[in-house]
Amino acid sequence: MLDFMDYIQLAFAEATNWNCDNSYSSLTATAQSLLDFSTPERLRVHLSSLATPHFATSYTLGTVGLIDGSVSYLYSTVPLNNTPSRSALIPLRKLARGYRQVQPPVAPVEDCGWQSCLGGLGSSESKPSGNDDSQPSPGRKATLLNATLHLPPPTILNALFLRRMSPTMQLSLAVCSTRGAPLSNSAPQASLLGQLSHDTGKYSNEYLFSTDNSLFGWRGLWNFGPDPRHPKENSSPQLSLLSAGAEAYYSPVSSLIGMSTGLRFSTLPAATEMPSSSSSASSTTTTSNHDTPISTFPYTLTLVLTPLTGSLSTTYSLRASPNLAFSSRFGFNVYSWESEMVAGCELWRKRRKPSPPPVDDDGLEWARRKMRMADTPAFAPVEPPTTHNRDEENESVLKIRVDQSWNVRLLWEGRVKELLVSAGVGLGPSSFSSPSRAANSTPAGGGQSVGGGISGRSYWHGVGVSISYSS
């Protein structure tokens, strides 16, 4: 489940119309959400709040074996007025990332008033002097500041500076500083990661630099098909999307070189929708006889190749129903002949709370309803159906992941009252070992076994619960 600050950062990206999925780093995001999810390892409590549309805070406390915590603050020049912040109102599918439907590429807004749009203003008119200063000026560009302090020692400080330079460019600066030992006189270790992103909808480029070993990097993604910046009139909706990308890294200090390339093919929402009856004459001649969608379910295929290490990875993810999704991954190394196979699924469940009976029901309510029906006219207007409040729905998701060594992860995420709860467990093949061997295993909270269970380790990879509350 996403942290509250990560959720606010996604809300900032949506408010500024920045497409986080149009990036090479998100090429395998769907498979990673279904296969590489992490389970809580102990008890953690999160308390968060969006105090104002511009300011958010978050506090975390972890216990069982080791007590630690963190304090996080976030400031945004863009007002997040339409962002649900209460844990009882936040859509669970935005926090528990599962199958991610790829959307068609969208061209950035290139009008001259994009600063005012990002600043939350509808016009460039000057505000009266008596108004509050909650809305930024039209010339101010969208900016986000976030800082997190992890305690106890060794103290770690993480800071993030995010700024929209133009409709197609975004600058990100991330700092990580670690305090040394108490008796050490050396300066705290710190590293800076800068990233400049350029997204046009048709393609995207990312330029990276890290002070750690003076690492330079580049990532790029190209979407095949029509250019969203030059739309054609009366064009049919795009049914699928093929994307190709690559990344390269180089460090002149350590002479480190890294590169990879990948492909992604995914169906778009138009492929699973029913053809409309008001389509053009040319389209009706081909689709009028078949009133069925092009694809019965959304799916995503990816292929990633790392030439230097000889690694090849393929993934296949599909959403069989709105509440059920599957994913699988196969990896192979041409140099060592080692392979990896992982499969996983997620199942969403929704349960509505039964409506309580009327308080003043004395057993004669049926007679009163009969009398009201007799007094109403024959053609009385039909009342619209009552919509269920979000609080009347309990939604939860169960994720399962297993690899070729029978290492299993189970994760349940849901809402209990006004709390967001995540509970998970990791199991391995060492569970079939003898009790004496399990007694001589690593201490409680020990590390995760690798590659099918090492002799002498407990089969419990990690058991934990995470509880979150936000206001």
Swiss-Prot record:
Domain remark from Swiss-Prot or TrEMBL: Lacks alpha-helical transmembrane segments, suggesting that it resides in the membrane via beta-sheet conformations similar to those predicted for other outer membrane proteins and porin.
Function as written in the Swiss-Prot or TrEMBL entry: Component of the ERMES/MDM complex, which serves as a molecular tether to connect the endoplasmic reticulum and mitochondria. Components of this complex are involved in the control of mitochondrial shape and protein biogenesis and may function in phospholipid exchange. mdm10 is involved in the late assembly steps of the general translocase of the mitochondrial outer membrane (TOM complex). Functions in the tom40-specific route of the assembly of outer membrane beta-barrel proteins, including the association of tom40 with the receptor tom22 and small TOM proteins.
Biased composition (Gly residues): 444-455
UniProt family annotation: Belongs to the MDM10 family.
Subunit structure, interactors included: Component of the ER-mitochondria encounter structure (ERMES) or MDM complex, composed of mmm1, mdm10, mdm12 and mdm34. Associates with the mitochondrial outer membrane sorting assembly machinery SAM(core) complex.
Record GO biological process: establishment of mitochondrion localization; mitochondrial genome maintenance; mitochondrial outer membrane translocase complex assembly; mitochondrion-endoplasmic reticulum membrane tethering; phospholipid transport; protein insertion into mitochondrial outer membrane
Keywords: Membrane, Mitochondrion, Mitochondrion outer membrane, Transmembrane, Transmembrane beta strand
Membrane protein topology class: Multi-pass membrane protein
Region (Disordered) residue spans: 429-455
Subcellular location(s) of the protein: Mitochondrion outer membrane
Name used for this protein in its record: Mitochondrial distribution and morphology protein 10
GO cellular component: ERMES complex; SAM complex
Pfam families: MDM10 (PF12519)
